[in-house]
Structure formats: structure tokens, C-alpha cells
Amino acid sequence: MQKWKKLSFCAVLLTSLAFAGCGTPQASTTGETTGAKQEQSSAPQTMQVNLNSGEPSTIDPGLAEDIPSMSVARAAFDGLLRLNEKGELKEAVAEKYEVSADGLTYTFHLRESKWTNGDPVTAHDFEYAWKRVLDPKTASGYAYQMYYLKNGQAFNANKAKAEDVGVKATDDKTLVVTLENPAPFFPELVASVTYFPVNKKAVEGNKEWASKPETYMTNGPFTLKNWEHKSKIEFEKSDSYWDKDAVKLSTLTLNMIEDANTELSMFEKGDLDWAGSPLGDLPLDALDALKESGKMQAQATAGTYWYIFNTTQKPFDNKKIRQAFATAVNRQEISDNVVPYKSTPATGILPPTMALTPEGYIKDGNVETAKKLLAEGMQEAGIKELPPITIAYNTSEVNSRIATVIQDQWRKAFGIEVKLVNKENKVHREDMKQGNFTIGRGSWIGDFNDPINFLEVFKGGLNTSKWENKEFIDLLAQSAKEGDVAKRKEILKKAEQIVMDEMPALPIYYFTYAWVKQDSVKDVVVDALGFIDFKYASNQK
């Protein structure tokens, strides 16, 4: 998942809370669960949160690529499966499902549920939505998440027809899915935003269907009530939702306040019920006091903050020059001085929850080696001086501080001046996609707990570095067909080694989220992959 992770926002870092081992990360649920423990108040419950990235890039689930966009879609839509209030994967629109003995066929049986216009949600809606994501005309950056479907990649590459794709509604209530290869994590994928249904009538009736309340047809806990662009997005509880009794909030408002100090000030005044990650930000200078007050909560997240090199532009079309700039970065200095409480320096692409090489790949802040690599790279490139270099990042306090420190580290290591450019999030993302950058701030937080999800970022539509390596691509394809867990791990380890040797991205740190909430807020689910879900949230003031 892009978390501009990965990408549109910055997770605040606290004491390193790396997950133990490589098991499935657990979600966090705020406060005690309500349910039978509390009598439901008759007064309407509302919640005010902040979306500090500003305007979501889209609220179309088939096009969503970042946490803000996906969080909005998660409030408005429901998939076949969903995390419950305890963070457990449970049936949602699917009442039940079966998996064949060979792990290749999933059969989902749908319950009675409705769209906001009253039409029934059918298996045909899911078939249409999934094939729409894969359709090359849609140009979905997340189409690769559907490559696990039989002929999914072939259809996306115009080498197969839509009817060849392994998803078929055999009737209104039955969806049969056939995979290319067994994928034990497929149920996790099915719960992700990309796999949400969309209503064909709404999508094809208006190209701008996902921009106005009157055309935004949804099937989830909330329905879009109002969208004041660059100000706020307002949701109200959906009366047509199949599980509406579990939804306690009457309204949910996502404000768009980009300044972290303003966000915290509004929280302290009671104008916000939640401040900080995953959707907002907390001012770094306030973290000590918030921690000491006991109000702040923290949760490790399966994500990596990195810089992307544009490998089509000089000088970063040269591998050794990329290695030089990566090696010169002192990540420990950033952890100790830029972001408090010793965040974990990232010496590899994969976060600790998925690490294949726990010791990492990069010797942190090795200036002498960096100088040697730079000299060798410049000689190979036939240049005597470096062209102008710019670090581009989306606006946030943390992003700015990190860029300033790395700018200084490269100045001291190489005697060069690096320009810093901050941009509104949507502009930054589009410039990255179009290749209008030299070095760009980015990140990734897993969509599911498997190394392949991180490694696949460096191929296909999300690969903003434009780096290509045939051996790497072949290894990823080989891993998809390998049924032996140990052998598959070794294949992915080789693939990661290639990425770290070629260095299309410069890893900087591993994410930890931090937030504060009003005492009345309960049952907000923050999963270990960086998503927030308000379906079960309550706010009895």
C-alpha cells in the first residue's frame, strides 16, 4: 500500500516497537470494546478526525493507492472479508467461503446486502470490480494486487480477455475465484480496498461518480454526506448497510488540516476526537509531553520510509552513485536527533516483521566507502561533477526535518549542495508517477504480511524509480510458483539482495505510529499494516 505511506503522510516515530519474529502483526483496538459492556446512549455519536495530507487523491476503491484514499474507501465500502473490532479477519459481505484442497479455488457465498440506492450487492458486482481494476484502460496502480487471479496479469497486459480472468459470478450469491498459484495470504488481500465491489451502474453512468455524494454509490458502514474540497469530508451512518447495528457513529468527519500544531491544538480544545497517525500528524516538539502525560499511544507498523532514486535521470542512472548516496546517510543520527525515542534505522527494504536478512544490508553512515563509490560511479558515468540534485517531499514537519539532515549529511560527505522542494501531497504523488523528480520521498506499508508485497513495489505501475532488472522479475515469478516455504524464502531473499545491491530506493527508517484520542473514543481499529477503521468506533461523550 502506498503510504505517502506510503507517500501521503508521515508516521510519527517513538520507541522502537518492532514486532517479534515474522508472524502476522496484530491490530490495535482503542479502549475497551463496547458491545454488551455498555448501554448504548440514545444521543447521536459523532467523531472528528484529521486528514493532514489534504485532499485524497481519489476515493474510488479501484484506484486508491495511499492510506488517506484507502481509509475513506474503507469507511464507505465493505468487501467479502473485513477485520472485526478485535482485529480478526472475519466474513463481511461473504457469509462464508470454502477453499479447495489444492489452494487454487475460493468459493464465496454472499449474504443479503445492499447498495445505498437500495439495489442488492451481488457476486456480479465483485466480478465487475475486480476485472475493472485489471482492465488496462482503467490504469489502476494497484492492478498488480489482482495478478494472483488466474490470467489476471495477462489481461492487464492485453494478452488475455476479461472472460479468461479467474473470477466468476456463477449466480447472484456465489463468486468463484481461481488463482494462478496457491496464495495463503489471499484472504488478507480479499479484505483490502482494491478488492472492494463497485456498482457498475454508478461507475459507467458518470465518470466523476466518486467525487460527489449524490453519485458515490457505496455498500459500507458510512455514506458520503458532504465533501468541501480542501476543507473536510463528512460521512453519515448508512441505513442500508447489512451490519448497521454494529455501527455506533452517526457521523464521521475527516478534516483537512495540514499543520501538525494546529491539529494538536484543535484536539486539546476538543474540536478533534483523534490526532496523529494513521491519518494525521503530531508535532515532534510535543511528543515528550504527550508521552509523559500518558495520553499518547504507539504501535509498530509493517512499513519502511525511504527515498526513491529516479534511475532514468543522471546521475542516478548509475548504480554506484546510488549506492554512494545511500551509504553516506547516517540513519542512526536521524533516529536519535530528528525523530525522538530512537526509531529503528532501516538498513533494508523489508520491515522487521518480514525481514529475510535481519542484520540488514547497509553499513550506516560509512562516508569513506560512500566517497569511494561516488568516485567510481562518476568515472563509469564519464562525469567530473554532479548535476543539480533535488530532494522532493510532500509537506510535513517530519519530512522537512529528515530532508534537511540528509541534505547536510551529503554536503559534508561529498561537498555538494542539494536543493529541497516540498509540495502538496497530491502534486508530489503525481510528479513521482510522471518521473518529475531526482530523489523523491516515499514509503510503503504492507497490504498483507508477506515480503512479496514490498518487493513487488519495484516492478509495474508503482515502480516510480523506473528501475528494471530481469533476474529480479524472474525471481518474483519463481517465488509465486514455489510451494515449499523454506525454498520460497530463499528465492525472495535473493530478490531482496538484488534490490539492495541495485539500490533504486534508499531505506531510512521503519514506521511506528503515534496518536492521541479523547477518553470517550473506543473501538477504533488500527491494524498493523497502517489502516484505520471506524466501523466499530464509538464516542459517547
Regions found by a protein language model. Name each.
Residues E127, A143-K200:
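Surface-exposed binding/hinge segments that line
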Residues L179-V247, T251:
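Gly/Pro-rich hinge or "lid" segments in bacterial periplasmic/extracellular proteins
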Residues T344-G377, S396-R401:
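Structural transition elements
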Residues N50-A101, M217:
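N-terminal lobe/hinge region of extracytoplasmic solute-binding protein
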Residues E95-Y142, V176, P315:
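Aromatic- and charge-enriched surface segment that lines or borders ligand/interaction sites
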Residues K207-A210, S240-D285:
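Ligand-site clamp/hinge motif
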Residues A123-A129, D172-T178, P182, G220-P221, ...:
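Alpha-helical secondary-structure segments
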Residues E417-H428, E456-S520, Q540-K541:
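Extracytoplasmic/peripheral linker and loop segments enriched in polar/acidic and small residues
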